[in-house]
């Protein structure tokens, strides 16, 4: 993700108002915990963890968690929250384009509302990294934006199916796919 986008997330995560919509785990993620436990998953990465809503949730359910984000303010908040709750998280400021893990490290990888921030090439590199660190037969849970989304085509086109909304220099691209 571009440095300016990371700066924008740092600004957002630094305030309670900016974090407010990102504190509760998404039900689709929370609902997968029984499946992960049944499959024997123990060590999970949350790529683009933001303020840690999913990373903290997984830690509360006994998983060893790798919380990864480009924005330091989100990681700082997740670190404070983990300490306040008596939870352990491994927090890393890193880019999903080059994950700091060995091949086939995880039974499950989460990337919620993150990997579509960029062009098709960016998304492809992130998906390649996810597949690299995912064990054979492992599960990937993530989100993408659809061309059927009402936001598709809004903003300034910077690449095929990729748009930046708004004129803020810190705005980041959104890639839409079929």
Language-model regions, residue ranges each:
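A short SAM/SAH-binding and catalytic strip from SAM-dependent methyltransferases
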Residues: 108-122
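Class I (Rossmann-like) S-adenosyl-L-methionine-dependent methyltransferase catalytic domain
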Residues: 1-41, 51-98, 122, 139-178
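A short glycine-rich, Lys/Arg-flanked "PGG" loop and its adjoining helix->strand segment in the class I
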Residues: 124-136
């Amino acid at each position: 993700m571009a440095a300016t986008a990371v700066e924008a997330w740092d600004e957002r995560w630094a305030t309670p108002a900016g974090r407010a919509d990102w504190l509760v785990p998404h039900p689709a993620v929370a609902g997968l915990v029984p499946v992960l436990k049944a499959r024997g998953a123990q060590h999970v990465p949350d790529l683009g963890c933001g303020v840690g809503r999913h990373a903290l949730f997984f830690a509360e359910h006994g998983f060893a968690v790798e919380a990864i984000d480009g924005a330091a303010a989100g990681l700082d908040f997740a670190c404070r929250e983990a300490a306040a709750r008596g939870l352990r998280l491994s927090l890393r400021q890193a880019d999903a384009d080059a994950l700091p893990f060995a091949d086939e490290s995880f039974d499950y990888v989460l990337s919620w509302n993150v990997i579509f921030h960029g062009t098709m090439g960016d998304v492809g590199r992130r998906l390649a990294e996810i597949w690299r660190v995912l064990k054979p037969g492992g599960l990937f849970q993530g989100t993408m934006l659809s061309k059927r989304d009402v936001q598709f085509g809004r903003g300034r086109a910077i690449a095929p199916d990729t748009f930046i909304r708004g004129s803020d220099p810190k705005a980041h691209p959104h890639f839409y796919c079929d």
